[in-house]
Amino acid sequence: MRFSTPIEISPLPFQLTPQSHIVVLGSCFAEHIGQRLERALPPDRVSVNPFGVLYHPTVLARALARIAFAHPLPEDIFFEGRDGLWHSWWHAGAFSAPTREECQRLVEASLNQAHEVLQKADLLILTLSTDHGYYLKEELSCGSLVANCHKMPSKMFEEKVTSLEQSIGVWESLLPFIKAHYPQLRILWTVSPYRYAKHGMHESQLSKARLQLMIDHLIHSKTANDNPFLQISGSKVSTQSLERRKKMSEIFGETSEIFENILESMLKRSNDFTQYSERDQESTENYSKKEKEERKDAATSSFTSSVDTWQFYFPAYEMLLDELRDYRFFASDMLHPSEQAVDYIWEKFRETVFSSDLNDCASHPYSIRQALAHRPLHPESDDYRKFYTKTQQRIAEFTQKYGFAPQ
C-alpha cells in the first residue's frame, strides 16, 4: 500500500565532486539549498544569492548578466530609504547600510566574489518564484523593475505580470552569451514551492505554470542554446548578434554599450574570430564556401560548450505539492515549506547530483564539528588527550584527501 505519489527524478549526466564550484540564485528556497551546499563545500567554492533573495525571472537574468561579465553597477540603483538606510533597487535588504558608500561596498564585494566562483563553476542553480514584478513609476537609467521595494510607499510602484513570451525573450537573449563564455557550466532550474496567497491561489498556480513553461521552453529551445556570435552564410554575415544585443538593452534598461563590452571581452579569447565581424566582412568575400566554414569552425571552437546538454530541471515544486501533500510539511503560514520538507527535498537533491566522493566529503565535517564542540569534564585526562589527538588526525586526513579543511 502506498500513501504518496513519488516524483520520478530523471538521472542527470553529471555529478558534483568535492572540487566543484556552484552558484545559486533565486528565492528563499534557493537560500535553503545554498546554505546546505555551503556546509558541504568550502565557502570559496559556493556563492549563494550574491544579490540577495530574488524572485522574478527578469531580475534573476539581470543579476546573472552582471555576475557573469563583472560589469560595474549603475549609480542610480542606490537610494536612501524611509528608514534612514541606503538600499539598492537591484538587491535585497541584506545589503542595506547606513551610508551609500557602505551599501555600494557590500554589493560590489558580493558581485566580485560571485564572479570569481562562476569562473570555475560546474553548476548554476536558478530558482524562480513568481513572474509578478514591481516597477518604479519614475523611470531610472538602470530600468524600472526592482528586486525589492524596501518598504517604500506603494504609490511609487506598479505591479505587472510578465508574459510568458517576455520571460522567454529575456533568457533566450542572455543564455547563449552565458553558454559561450562559460562552456563548462551546467544550469539546474527549479521553481520555488512557496505559494503566493496574496495573488490568490489560482493566480499563484498560473504564475508557477508560466515559469515552468518558460523553463521547459528554454531547455529545448535552439535559440537559447545557439552561438551568440555573427554567423557566416555564403558571403554575408547575419545581424543576429546585433539584434540580440539590442533586445538585451531593452530588457535591462540600458544602452547597448554594456553588451558591446561583453562581446569585445569574449572576442579577445579568439584571435581569429574577429575576421567574422561585420567590419571584416569584405576581407572574407574571396574565400570559397568551404574555406569560410573551416575558418569559422576554427575561430568559434573556443566558444563551443564542453557539455552536450547543459540545462536541466529539478522538480522541487512537484515534490512538495505532490509527494509531500500534507500540511505537516508546511511552515506555520501554510505557504512556505517546513524545515522537514526542505530537508527531504535536499536529500533528494543530494541523491541526484552528489557523487559518492562528495557525499563522503559532506558527511565527515558534521561528525568532526561534533567532536570539536565536545566539552570534556576532565581535559587533562588520558582519554581526552587520545580523543583530541584522534580528532586532529581526522582533520589532517580529511584535508589531505579533499584539499581543504572541514568547515
PLM feature spans:
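A short mid-domain helix/strand-loop element embedded in enzyme catalytic domains
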Residues: 129-155, 186-188
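Active-site segments of SGNH/GDSL-like serine hydrolases
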Residues: 5, 131, 176-205, 315, ...
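Extracellular serine-dependent O-acyl
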Residues: 186-188, 212-227, 308-326, 362-363
